[in-house]
Amino acid sequence: MSTHPQIDQQVTFLYTHNLNASTEFYEQKLGLELWLDQGTCRIYTVSGSGYLGLCQASEKSTPPTDKQSSVIFTLVTQQVDEWFEYLKERDIEFEKSPTLNEKYNIYHCFFRDPDGYLIEIQRFETNDKKKDITK
């Protein structure tokens, strides 16, 4: 197995039709902290070295217009139920309440952002410390 050069950070970029609405959703509803404002693209700290970039769509870049997007933005936490209650208090409508997925051994829930991107709050249900990426 070869060793690759170090990766310092990771950013997932999502296009939005309305940067102001997405900014309000991710800042006010999810409570993410703005890390870098580039005008038409805003980058938020998710955790440690993980970031989310929201970019205003241009005529050449089209975000999904329906709920069939293949992107899932997953936030991993031990506190799935706490996040569920926190977001319900902020009037977030869930597509799926917290449930155990036995196939993948995860506990999770789903909702969508203003552009229709699917967001998952998830906990790995494993006793194997090696696989528990939240610790």
Where are these regions (language model features)?
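N-terminal beta-strand motif that seeds the catalytic metal site of vicinal oxygen chelate
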Residues: M1-T23, V71-F73, E125-K135
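Short secondary-structure junctions
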Residues: G31-D37, F94-S97
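A generic local structural motif
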Residues: M1, L30, E59-T62, K96
